[in-house]
């Protein structure tokens, strides 16, 4: 018998909290982001899907917006993230993606929230930046912040499409932020989007 996702969410939430409490979290180069916040600006943290666990240890409880797959597994993730204070738009590249993007823009604009996006999710290809994060940052005039979650000790789920990384208890997690930048193009045609996705991928790889 399949257990409904909503019944699993509380246990997963408390498991995450207990696991997170064992980690030694270090945020690197957050000062440029703090200066943007001090000036009333918005940011979109852009990370790889396989490093999501480490990345949200630095951002939990910050009332951020994210986009989560419309799949059943996505329902579990959305439930846990919601309990952590995230606002989750449900969608993907193949289902409801445009609607989720519009919802995310509206909530970030109306509520003054920042965003966090797994740029190659929810199904890959691994470490290939998709278009959505570029459109999101451009529509909001928000700063993009390349973000890596680097763990000293981790379990790698080798059979997962993204080789998901789970930091082991007592591991040191370095959440490394690249320099924030804005998308300068006034309009986004496909060549401009392709340039921006390549630019972001290069910045992410350079961080680790």
Residue ranges and their predicted role:
Residues 82-85, 107-108, 161-168:
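Short, hinge-like loop/turn segments at secondary-structure boundaries
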């Amino acid at each position: 018998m399949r257990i409904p996702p909503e019944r699993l969410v509380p246990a997963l939430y408390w498991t995450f909290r207990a696991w997170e409490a064992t980690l030694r979290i270090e945020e690197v180069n957050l000062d440029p982001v703090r200066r943007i916040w001090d000036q009333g600006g918005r940011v979109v943290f852009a990370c790889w899907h396989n490093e999501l666990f480490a990345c949200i240890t630095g951002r939990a409880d910050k009332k951020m917006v994210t986009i989560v797959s419309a799949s059943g597994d996505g329902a579990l993730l959305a439930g846990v993230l919601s309990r952590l204070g995230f606002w989750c738009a449900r969608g993907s590249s193949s289902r409801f993606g445009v609607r989720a993007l519009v919802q995310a823009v509206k909530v970030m604009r109306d509520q003054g929230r920042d965003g966090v996006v797994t740029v190659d999710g929810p199904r890959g290809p691994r470490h290939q930046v998709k278009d959505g994060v570029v459109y999101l940052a451009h529509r909001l005039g928000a700063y993009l912040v390349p973000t890596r979650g680097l763990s000293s000790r981790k379990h790698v789920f080798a059979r997962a499409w993204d080789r998901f990384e789970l930091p082991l208890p007592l591991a040191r997690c370095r959440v490394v932020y690249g320099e924030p930048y804005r998308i300068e193009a006034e309009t986004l045609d496909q060549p401009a989007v392709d340039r921006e996705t390549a630019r972001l991928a290069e910045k992410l790889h350079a961080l680790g």
